[in-house]
Amino acid sequence: MHYSEEDIENLEKVFRINLINSCSGYKSANLIGSTSKTGINNLAIFSSITHLGSNPPLLGFFLRPTEIVPRHTYLNIKDNPYYTINSVQSEFVDKAHHTSAKYDREVSEFDITKIEPEYINNFPAPFVKSSSVKIGMKFVEEIKINYNKSRLIVGKIVELNIDDHLISVDGFINLSDAEVATISGCDGYSFPASNSRKGYQKPQKS
């Protein structure tokens, strides 16, 4: 099936959303935990988290325009620069997906979904207790994308909590062993079953 630029612009809204969200392939599924200035814990699923560098250790995630729809995660991070990124496992993927529902800011998705929060080392934002990979983040900067008014939120990793058996001797995290979810589109969840690791590549000698 071929879609021209004009075809894409004229697609039915939901079809276009699903098509464009899934055409780039699988994305990580993560829950971001944050706390409002009034102490309400927020939990929201994201599929846009990306690695930005290892030294310093930076992760970013994208937000749709904040001027149109309130983004509680964004508002909380502006009030409290600490937040968490947590893996999603098969046993609670349904609960994790429900955090995409648009509740009022004073409602905690932890309470609604019965996902248990966890506080580690006095970190000022809640982790997800059931997650195998828990990342403590501190907000660094935001970059506005003028073309569609989205924002890239950049944070620094300040704490890592990972199940011991998932970490290889070289630092690789075997997410397959924990049945960590990926997302295709907006609502298609998959669980990679194996890893195929390749060595560091150098130019071939002629």
Q: Predicted segments — roles?
A:
Residues 1-206:
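Basic, polyanion-binding surface patches
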